């Protein structure tokens, strides 16, 4: 048992401190290699343990040994690949995007990255919000965001660390009538940002967001694309 535990822990530590520092991003080899090494459990036992003992092992013993190896590798990998020893999880948005409730909006929906706004008037004034989330330090996450219409950028929303966007943070905190409530930034550690997009006509607007941070052992990156679809559903007299 101890041989298997030591072997599983050694594989986890070897991958974390020897293999991963030379990589730029997660790869299938991080999971495939340990699973392939399961085939070495039996030969290693037969080499180290005297044959008079190893020959007594049944198929059930070997199965339990392999299971213990996989469990040990997973447990140690989780410990050495997460804070405070490492950070391999990319930053993200806490709850996608949301808009401030305002006059002229008849109904809204949020599904699969598409925010649909149905109007009872020709145009609508849109204030959009989002919240940056990270498992270590959301403030230091570098965020680049822009809004596009028909393939052309109409405004750059963000370019810098989350904490550097003080005006956007103040605007987010000043709004208490988000359409989806507090789901856009439910945790106190989330960094809320908001922008006044101005008066928008019906159509589809694309929000492109890139977030990066210096993790350990590589740079963590998230790229998100959302759509704001505005439609006039009420016929005006």
Q: Model-derived features: where do they sit?
A:
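Membrane-associated alpha-helix detector
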Residues: 1-23
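Short alpha-helical packing/oligomerization segments
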Residues: 18-44
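Short, compositionally biased P/S/T/A/G/V-rich stretches that sit at domain boundaries
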Residues: 85-122, 160-162, 236-237
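Contiguous beta-strand segments within globular domains
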Residues: 112-147
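Aromatic sugar-binding surface patches on proteins
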Residues: 170-194
């Amino acid at each position: 048992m101890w041989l298997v535990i030591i072997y599983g822990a050694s594989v986890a530590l070897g991958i974390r401190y020897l293999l991963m520092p030379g990589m730029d991003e997660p790869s299938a080899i991080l999971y495939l290699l340990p699973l392939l090494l399961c085939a070495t459990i039996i030969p290693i036992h037969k080499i180290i343990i005297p044959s008079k003992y190893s020959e007594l092992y049944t198929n059930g013993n070997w199965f339990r040994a392999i299971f213990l190896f996989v469990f040990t590798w997973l447990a140690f990998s989780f410990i050495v690949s997460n804070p405070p020893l490492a950070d391999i999880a990319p930053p993200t948005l806490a709850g996608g995007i949301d808009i401030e409730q305002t006059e002229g909006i008849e109904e809204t929906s949020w599904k699969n990255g598409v925010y649909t706004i149905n109007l009872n008037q020709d145009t609508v004034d849109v204030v959009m919000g989002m919240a940056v989330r990270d498992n270590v330090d959301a403030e230091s996450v570098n965020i680049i965001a822009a809004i596009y219409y028909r393939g052309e950028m109409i405004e750059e929303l963000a370019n810098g660390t989350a904490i550097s966007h003080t005006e956007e943070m103040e605007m987010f905190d000043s709004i208490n009538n988000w359409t989806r409530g507090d789901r856009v930034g439910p945790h106190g550690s989330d960094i809320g940002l908001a922008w006044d997009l101005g008066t928008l006509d019906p159509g589809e607007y694309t929000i492109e967001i890139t977030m990066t941070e210096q993790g350990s052992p590589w740079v963590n990156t998230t790229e998100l694309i959302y759509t704001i679809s505005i439609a006039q559903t009420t016929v005006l007299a």
